[in-house]
Amino acid sequence: MSDMNKILQKWGASLRKGTDFDSWGQLVEAIDEYQILARQLQKEAQSPANSSDFTEDQKKTIGKIATCLELRSAALQYTQSQEGFTLEDVKKLEPILSSILTFNKEFPFDVQPVPLRRILAPGEEENLEVEEEEEDGGAGAGSPDLFPARVPGTLLPRLPSEPGMTLLTIKIEKIGLKDAGQCIDPYITVSVKDLNGIDLTPVQDTPMAVRKEDTYVHFNVEIEIQKHVEKLTKGAAIFFEFKHYKPKKRFTSTKCFAFMEMDEIRSGQIVIELYKKPTDFKRKRLQLLTKKPLYLHLLQTLLKD
């Protein structure tokens, strides 16, 4: 079996796994599977011609499938809506993905691949960003209409309750930044890491900010932490990475990050400090972003059955 056929077989198995979870009503698992596959497909769709065995037309179709998976994930997150991308729609993607090498029909959905924004490994962007303060200062000068909106965030629904277990909901209210108004397509990536920087839960992206004013970017969005508080390992932390699009470089960059440790989990409002990138998941070399009183503003809600 060729390498390409092995890749297609792997993608097909992942898609079927996602639709199985979807049909069984296991929404958290379905969203997670769809998101994992979508990222794999996006990475292939964005790969340079000299490092991919797929043609440009095939990569465009792969990118469209990734967009459809993002749309289904978004539909599952907002289950009260009767509209959006359906499970039956996703199932129509299976024969397209399996026959991508010979597929020559019109794509059944009016979608476009996620915009070609670079996917960078952690820390890679640091080698590309020179004179950042100067560059960021002009980043907001152009019309935001020039830059396509991101696919909706990858927020996951609340976990089922368990006797004696505590669920944590964190509302991201706003973040304080001196150049808040210049950030393009800002969003926050939320992850839960152990002391070694290993993920303890699925990573979630918020939708884009709802508004920007003065020195604040407002989100007003709730994140459901995907593990009961009692099951989080000692030394774990919840990370918040603020990201925005850099049009001159054509990639999405982490501007700063914040984190909350286990002893800070309690009901009510909390403000936490912002740190300079790159994101230090092991929390060993932390540098404050600014001496100004600018923070990430959160509201925590604990729910115990």
Curated annotation (Swiss-Prot):
Gene Ontology BP term (one): determination of ventral identity
Domain C2 Aida-type: 156-303
InterPro entries from the UniProt entry: Aida_C, AIDA_N, AIDA_N_sf, C2_domain_sf
Region annotation (Disordered) ranges: 126-146
GO cellular component term of the entry, any: membrane
Entry's Gene Ontology molecular function annotations: phosphatidylinositol binding
Record's function text: Acts as a ventralizing factor during embryogenesis. Inhibits axin-mediated JNK activation by binding axin and disrupting axin homodimerization. This in turn antagonizes a Wnt/beta-catenin-independent dorsalization pathway activated by axin/JNK-signaling.
Keyword Cell inner membrane found: no
Region (Axin-binding): 153-220
Keyword terms, alphabetized: Developmental protein
Domain of life, per lineage: Eukaryota
Similarity remark: Belongs to the AIDA family.
Amino acid composition bias (Acidic residues), ranges on this chain: 126-137
Name of this protein: Axin interactor, dorsalization-associated protein B
